[in-house]
């Protein structure tokens, strides 16, 4: 029965709410929120009044104690971020003060005890803040207390005598890797003969401190360069490979580098640096230039007072050097031409400076809006080097008019080196860019020891500045562009170090790719960082980064277990598997290129034509590099054996069939390098001034020479490669010596070449008749080819030449495996018609119309 007052729905809801309130444990009038409870109430899980002492602790005689609120509070995100930045700051300071001290807890505790004991003994704090002094003293103290640290003392007190030579290398790789680290440090000796400024010695000391803890990846060998100084090479260098081949072929002592050096001793200038530079720069030694500080005229001519640029610049102040550098800069129109050529040629594979920022800052310099005292020293050096490198690249394409030519190239390089010497005490982005550019210049001119030292300083400065984390001092770009610039410069430093390792065998300064390509974010397209009116080259940059990672890892794994190319026969199958694995990785890299990069090697009007061809050159260059041990193994084990003895399992050796695909791939890559180099030469884009493409073609010529010696393959383009090398190798003394060494080896062997020359005619006799005139190109070459084809009596609609020669693998794999690489001397390869020259359809139709209508050009 419902109660009497239960007359509506609202009364029912009120009754239910009152019943719910009465069921609560704490009455409404006595309910109170307590912000914190004491530790005793927390342990007993009872209600605490929040007072001190609380009611529960008073009732039960116990100690009422509250927890510290500051200790319980979790740190904020801002505090954690600031703490991590604080830790980075201390790490950077430790890198500067103690570059060779490990940053583990044990070493830091020893450092702290040493500093405390030094301060307690009354030592001055300033004496403890000298970079590189704390770690050496700590390691000395640790060596007296603990015998286990003797190796650390040895690494911290390495001496660098300029006249000493490294210990003789043993043939065993394991024993070489345990030798003294002097062999990996001697690259920094005598950084440059024209390093007149005393501060340039800091480059050597910084590079030495950086590479003290670096372990040599490959053994090194001591040879003599063109100047009689020792250079240290590992098996990845082409010079090492050529010396190993000539030693296996038992050449006479008359072909050693020392005897070849005698003929060129009179041609070597007294200045060390100028002999390694292009010959255009050697004019400074013969014709001193007296210039003075003045303003640049509009025609690009410069007038100076009585300052001899060939004299010692150490007497000049930094202010005077800035004035000289400012007046050596060409006008804006000329500088833009050279800068565009530089950005198009070299920023496809490296990244040095944002083009838009360079253009704006150069315009400010040219307009004289900034006082010479406040000029950015780093940008002055960057501007000089960019203009110089762009000038050399532009000279490869065409002959420049007189008003555009630079008359003080040598002075610009020397002044830039002096400006960089004043930047060594600073760690800024502009100083890293300037040192990096100078390292690239020395690398391109073949002065690898200087390039190695400057590159080591640039890498150390970039690490100290924190470029890997996007920390720069550049305020002219936004946050995204600044981070992207830092990433690109870090990748560029690693790519240049990879090139030094691949070409010259110089051990990398740091572990270039510790986590593969995951150590840094790959570059992306940022419009603010691209050059105006020029296509973006970011995809070429990403491709060359992946190439460098594959090459360094592959060559390291390939050569680390080999000893002077004299591998044991039982280890040859493992080596063969390694080479085939590298082949597949290189092919995958090439297949992942863009369509323009794969098929852009024919259109010479494309602005990225040289970059596209260079990617293909690098691919074939890697194939040739990794194939050298296979060829050397074949030379030492099978070359002296008769062809009928090539049976499977002979003397526990692998059969010749196992080497078919590898030697064929190497031979085709060597031929492709010659063809691509000829294409660059005909297009006027061959880098004749610099060393990079010369080294690739030189390595290909060595391989072709070895194929000719062993009578392997057909249509060997060795003569064409020698002609190209003669055209390219006349710029530096070192390249001349290396080319003469290869030619003298060919003359001794007197090879019967399979190219367009009679049988039994020596190869050395054909040097003078190697197509020394420029070959025709374009429509005339195509017309001559049609005429030659029509007069060869070949039926139309059929394959040209022998059916077996259409497939490239047929010339390497005949029916009988024992005759796979032997050239049949009875065949006349000169009767095969030539391949048609490349001719754009637009040019062909235009010339046809001109001939039909007799319009004339």
From Swiss-Prot:
Bias (Polar residues) ranges: 803-819
Pfam families named among the record's database cross-references: Fungal_trans (PF04082), Zn_clus (PF00172)
Family matches, as SUPFAM superfamilies: Zn2/Cys6 DNA-binding domain
GO MF annotations in UniProt: DNA-binding transcription activator activity, RNA polymerase II-specific; RNA polymerase II cis-regulatory region sequence-specific DNA binding; zinc ion binding
Extent of Low complexity compositional bias: 159-175
Keyword Flavoprotein: no
UniProt subcellular location: Nucleus
Function: Transcription factor that activates the nmt1 promoter. Regulation of thiamine repressible genes. Negatively regulates conjugation during meiosis, by inducing negative regulators which delay conjugation. Involved in thi1 regulation.
Descriptive protein name: Thiamine repressible genes regulatory protein thi5
Taxonomic placement: Eukaryota, Fungi, Dikarya, Ascomycota, Taphrinomycotina
């Amino acid at each position: 029965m419902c109660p009497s007052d239960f007359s509506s729905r609202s009364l029912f809801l009120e009754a239910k709410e009152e019943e719910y309130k009465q069921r609560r444990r704490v009455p409404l009038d006595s309910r109170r929120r307590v912000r914190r409870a004491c530790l005793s109430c927390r342990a007993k899980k009872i209600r605490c009044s929040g007072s001190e002492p609380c009611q529960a602790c008073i009732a039960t005689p116990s100690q009422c104690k509250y927890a510290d609120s500051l200790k319980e509070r979790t740190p904020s995100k801002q505090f954690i971020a600031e703490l991590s930045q604080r830790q980075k700051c201390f790490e950077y300071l430790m890198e500067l003060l103690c570059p060779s001290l490990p940053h583990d807890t044990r070493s830091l505790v020893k450092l702290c005890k040493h500093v405390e004991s030094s301060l307690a003994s009354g030592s001055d704090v300033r004496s403890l803040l000298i970079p590189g002094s704390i770690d050496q003293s700590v390691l000395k103290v640790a060596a007296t207390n603990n015998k286990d640290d003797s190796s650390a003392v040895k690494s911290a007190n390495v001496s660098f005598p300029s006249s000493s030579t490294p210990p003789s290398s043993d043939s065993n790789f394991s024993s070489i890797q345990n030798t003294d680290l002097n062999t990996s440090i001697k690259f920094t000796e005598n950084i440059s003969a024209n390093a007149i400024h005393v501060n340039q010695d800091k480059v050597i000391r910084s590079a030495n401190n950086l590479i003290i803890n670096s372990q040599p990846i490959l053994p090194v060998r001591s040879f003599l360069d063109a100047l009689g100084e020792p250079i240290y090479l590992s098996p990845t260098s082409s010079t090492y490979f050529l010396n190993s081949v000539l030693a296996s072929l038992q050449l006479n002592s008359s072909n050693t580098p020392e005897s070849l050096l005698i003929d060129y001793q009179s041609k070597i200038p007294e200045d060390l640096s100028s002999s390694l530079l292009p010959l255009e720069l050697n004019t400074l030694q013969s014709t001193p230039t007296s210039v003075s500080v003045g303003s640049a005229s509009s025609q690009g001519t410069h007038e100076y007072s009585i300052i001899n640029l060939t004299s010692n610049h150490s007497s000049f102040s930094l202010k005077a050097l800035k004035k000289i550098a400012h007046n050596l800069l060409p006008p804006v129109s000329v500088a833009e031409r050279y800068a565009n050529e530089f950005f198009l040629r070299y920023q496809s594979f490296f990244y040095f400076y944002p083009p838009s920022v360079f253009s704006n800052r150069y315009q400010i310099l040219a307009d004289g809006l900034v006082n010479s005292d406040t000029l950015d020293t780093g940008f002055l050096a960057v501007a000089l080097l960019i203009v110089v490198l762009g000038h050399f690249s532009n000279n490869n394409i065409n002959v420049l008019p007189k008003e555009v030519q630079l008359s003080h190239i040598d002075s610009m390089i020397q002044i830039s080196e002096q400006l960089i010497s004043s930047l060594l005490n600073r760690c800024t982005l502009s100083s890293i860019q300037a040192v990096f550019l100078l390292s690239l210049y020395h690398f391109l001119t073949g002065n690898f020891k200087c390039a190695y030292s400057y590159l080591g300083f640039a890498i150390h400065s970039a690490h100290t500045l924190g470029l890997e984390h996007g920390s720069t001092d550049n305020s002219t770009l936004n946050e995204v562009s600044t981070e992207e610039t830092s990433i690109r410069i870090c990748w560029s430093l690693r790519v240049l170090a990879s090139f030094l390792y691949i070409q010259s065998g110089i051990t990398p300064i740091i572990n270039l790719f510790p986590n593969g390509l995951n150590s840094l974010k790959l570059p992306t397209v940022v419009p603010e960082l691209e050059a105006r009116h020029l296509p973006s080259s970011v995809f070429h940059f990403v491709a060359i980064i992946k190439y460098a990672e594959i090459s360094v890892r592959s060559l390291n794994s390939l050569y680390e277990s080999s000893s002077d190319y004299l591998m044991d026969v039982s280890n040859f199958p493992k080596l063969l598997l390694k080479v085939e694995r590298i082949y597949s990785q290189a092919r995958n890299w090439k297949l992942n290129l863009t369509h323009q990069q794969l098929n852009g090697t024919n259109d010479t009007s494309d602005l990225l034509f040289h970059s596209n061809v260079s990617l293909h050159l690098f691919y074939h260059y890697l194939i040739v590099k990794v194939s050298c041990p296979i060829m050397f193994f074949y030379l030492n084990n099978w070359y002296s054996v008769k062809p009928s003895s090539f049976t499977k399992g002979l003397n526990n050796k692998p059969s010749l069939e196992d080497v078919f695909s590898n030697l064929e791939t190497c031979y085709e890559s060597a031929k492709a390098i010659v063809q691509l180099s000829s294409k660059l030469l005909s297009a006027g884009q061959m880098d004749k001034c610099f060393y990079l493409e010369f080294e690739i073609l030189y390595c290909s010529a060595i391989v072709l020479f070895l194929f000719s010696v062993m009578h392997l393959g057909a249509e060997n383009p060795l003569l064409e490669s020698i002609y190209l090398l003669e055209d390219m190798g006349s710029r530096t003394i070192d390249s001349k010596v290396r080319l003469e060494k290869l030619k003298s080896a060919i003359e001794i062997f007197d090879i019967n070449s399979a190219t367009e020359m009679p049988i039994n005619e020596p190869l050395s006799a054909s040097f003078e008749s190697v197509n020394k005139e420029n070959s025709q190109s374009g429509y005339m070459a195509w017309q001559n080819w049609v005429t030659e084809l029509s007069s060869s009596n070949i039926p139309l609609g059929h394959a040209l030449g022998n059916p077996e020669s259409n497939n490239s693998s047929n010339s390497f794999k005949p029916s009988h495996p024992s005759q796979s690489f032997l050239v049949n001397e009875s065949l006349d390869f000169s009767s095969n018609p030539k391949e048609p020259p490349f001719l754009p359809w637009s040019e062909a139709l235009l010339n046809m119309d001109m001939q039909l209508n007799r319009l004339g050009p």
